Amino acid sequence: MSLSNKLAITDVDLKDKRVLIRVDFNVPLDADKKITNNQRIVGALPTIKYAIENGAKAVVLMSHLGRPDGKANPKYSLKPVATELEKLLSKSVIFAENCVGKETEEIVNKATGGQIILLENLRFHAEEEGSSKDAEGKKVKADKEKVEEFRKGLTALGDVYINDAFGTAHRAHSSMVGVDLPQKASGFLVKKELEYFAKALESPQRPFLAILGGAKVSDKIQLIDNLLPKVNSLIITGAMAFTFKKTLENVKIGNSLFDEAGSKIVGDIVEKAKKNNVKIVLPVDYVTADKFAADAKTGYATDADGIPDGYMGLDVGEKSVELYKKTIAEAKTILWNGPPGVFELEPFANATKKTLDAAVAAAQSGSIVIIGGGDTATVAAKYGAEAKLSHVSTGGGASLELLEGKVLPGVDALSSK
C-alpha cells in the first residue's frame, strides 16, 4: 500500500456535486450533552470549507460517536455537534435523524448552494461496524445482506467520497471501505497524515531516527521489526528499556517493569539491528521511586549501581537525556512513539520534557519530526509544542498499525492517482 499516490480532495472536481465526507466527530460530551472538547470538529473545518468554496451542491457529513453497539441511543446522538458546527462555520447545518434511508436521501437531494447536512451516528446501525452487542453484551454479527444494503444507502448520498477520519482508518467499517463511488479521496487531515508517514516510511531524509518508548517489548515487536530495515538509529526508552538492560547487560532493575515474554526476543532485535547497521541507544541512568505515585520517595541510579530492590525506574536521568539529545541533533528525520518516563507525574516528567525540547529544536533547524499519535501526542499537546513540530498524528491505533507495516483498510479503499 503506497501512501504517496492516493487521490486527495484537491485532485477532485467538486462543482455541483454531493460531497460525502467521513469525518471524525467522536467528541467528548458531558452529562448535559455539552461538548467538552471541540478539537476534532475544528480539525475537519478546512475540508468542509474547501468543499463549500469549490462549489459543492451539498456537503454531507457522517461520523460515529461513542459505542452505542449498533442500536439507536439518544446519549450518543450527534445532534449537539450540529449546533457546534453552525457556531464554528456561521452557516446553517441540517441534522438528518438517520444516516441512511429515503428521508435522508430526500434531504440530501434537495440541498443546494453548499448546504451542510450532518447525518445521525453511523454506529446506531450494526451494519457500520459489522456487529452489535446483545443484552448479555455478547457480539452478534450483522447480516451480510443488510450490511450491503447499508453500504448502498450511504453510497446513495454522494457523488464524491472524501475520507477525513484518520483515527478510524485501521477499521474496515462500512463508512470507511463500503462507499462505492467512482472517486474516493482523502480530506486535508488524512492527506497530511499520509504525506508525513510517507516521508518517514517510504522516502526518509537520512539519518533517520526512531524513538520508541512504551511499557512492553512484546507490544512493540511488530513496530521494531518494521522499522529496523528503515532507520539508521533507534532510541529505546520508557519502561521497555529495562527489559533490554537486564537481558543484554544484566543491569539490576529493582522493581521496574520486566517483560518476560519480551526478554526472549531482545537478542533477535539486537542481531537484526546489527545486520541493518542500526545504532541502538539505550538509557544509562534512571530516576527511581519507591512507589508509582507523585509523592513517592525518589532516588537516582546508574547502570553500574543498578536500581535497588523496592525501587523502580519511572524516568531516565540526565546522562541518558544527553545521549538522546545528541542522537536527535544528528538526525534529519525523527519519528517518536512513546515517552521516556511517566510524564503524567511531575517528578518523572523531566526526560520527556527535555526530549520534546530537543525534538522541537530539531524541527526548527529543518529536520522532519513526526509524533506517532497516542501518549506522545498527549505530551506535545500538554507542553504546547504541536505547532512547533512537523506533524503530530491524530490516529492512535491507526498510526501504530501504519508504523507496524500493516495495510489500513480506510487508506487502501481510497482511489489511486
UniProtKB/Swiss-Prot annotation:
Cofactor(s) it depends on: Mg(2+)
PANTHER family associated with the record: PHOSPHOGLYCERATE KINASE
Protein name: Phosphoglycerate kinase
UniProt enzyme class: transferase
Recorded catalytic activity of this chain's protein: (2R)-3-phosphoglycerate + ATP = (2R)-3-phospho-glyceroyl phosphate + ADP
Database matches in InterPro entries: Phosphoglycerate_kinase (IPR001576), Phosphoglycerate_kinase_CS (IPR015911), Phosphoglycerate_kinase_N (IPR015824), Phosphoglycerate_kinase_sf (IPR036043)
Assembly and interaction partners: Monomer.
Pfam families named among the record's database cross-references: PGK
Superkingdom of source: Eukaryota
GO-annotated biological processes: gluconeogenesis; glycolytic process
Transmembrane stretches, start-end: none
Binding sites annotated in the UniProt record for AMP: A215, K216, K220, A239, G313, E344
Cellular component, GO annotation: cytosol; mitochondrion
Listed EC numbers: 2.7.2.3
Annotated gene: pgkA
CDD domains, alphabetized: Phosphoglycerate_kinase
Keyword Transmembrane helix attributed: no
Residues binding Mg(2+): A215, D219, D375
Keyword presence, Metal-binding: yes
